[in-house]
Amino acid sequence: LDISFGKKEIFLQQPTRFYFPGLPQRAFFERDEFPWLSELEAKTPQMKAELEAMLGGKEQFSPYLDSGNNEPNFAKHLDIVDNLNWSAAYLWRYGKLDESITRQCPITMQALKSAPLPFIAGQTPVALFSKLKAGVKIPPHHGLLNTRLICHLPIIVPKDCGGLRVGNQTREWEEGK
């Protein structure tokens, strides 16, 4: 009804690199649809300890968006490009393992083995710790593809940090879920 009365907008997939027609238009998938997820979530406290140890040392995060990246449409997010307002420490980036990060996170790497990660040379998997500075907002954006699911596991969740909006649905962040 909210859509009928103009209170909510219809959001459709608009991937920037590849669109596969006919896939369902779903904002969120439910956790119970993935039998491997509970095993991964159970390791959240240990993954948090690994992440906190990383955060307590020298800076190992780099800008999540950088101007040297060839991904389409990054320019519209210029307020978070080439700075650490939104940053990442990649375990895997475009299928390449970063041993300087992964050797600090053996439990995280073990937990990721429970997930059905795709291995495509030069493309996947991609797995990372993402860090957003207080007060910074990630602008609305579209993913690269509609043929994969991106899973977020909140490991450190500050009080009143908001939620994840997909289309016209928002879900609050909950540590470990």
PLM feature segments, named:
Residues 155-175:
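A short beta-strand-loop-beta hairpin characteristic of the jelly-roll/cupin
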Residues 128, 152-154:
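Structured core elements
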Residues 1-128, 132-145, 160-161:
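Fe(II)/2-oxoglutarate oxygenase catalytic core
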Residues 86, 174-177:
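Generic detector of bulky aromatic hydrophobic side chains
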